[in-house]
Amino acid sequence: MTQDTIFSPFFATVFLTFLVWVYMYIRRISFITSRKLTQKELAVPGTLAQISPPSVSNPSDNLKNLFEIPVLFYALVLYLFITKQVDTVYVNAAWVFVVFRTLHSAVHCTFNLIILRFYLYLFATLAVWFIAIRAALIHFGTND
């Protein structure tokens, strides 16, 4: 396995963020045009969020979520690559994160079953914490 193998799940997460961003704008623009909202009505911060139904606000909320735990994931991937620690365990854990994070986004942006979304988020986040804890143990367990 080459060190750059870790960038496949990295860029899969970037692509997921792009897809949610596009979907969010499709939902927002459709809502704004169907309601014939004016620029003046949208000028006050938070107005769109207050008047938007879940089908519009959920993709926006999910996009915000993609700049929380995934940022830690990106940092860990870069750390693993720079320190040449990428191995099968890390790559598999990274793919676990991507799969559960993608499912979480799909649920959040569509039917939004909260308990399902919670478990998908939990499993994705546990994969990131596993990567972080394992990397920290290896880092601090070495005698330099």
Map each language-model feature to its residues:
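Short membrane-interface loop/juxtamembrane segments of multi-pass integral membrane proteins
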Residues: A43-L63
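Alpha-helical transmembrane segments
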Residues: T13-V20, F73, L126-I133
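Structural signature of hydrophobic alpha-helical transmembrane segments
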Residues: D87-V98
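Interfacial loop-to-transmembrane junctions
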Residues: L103-A127
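Short juxtamembrane and helix-loop transition motifs at transmembrane-helix boundaries
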Residues: S52-P59, Y79-V89, F140
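Core segments of transmembrane alpha-helices
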Residues: K64-Y79
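N-terminal signal-anchor transmembrane alpha helix
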Residues: D4-L42
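Juxtamembrane boundary at the C-terminal end of a transmembrane helix
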Residues: I131-D144
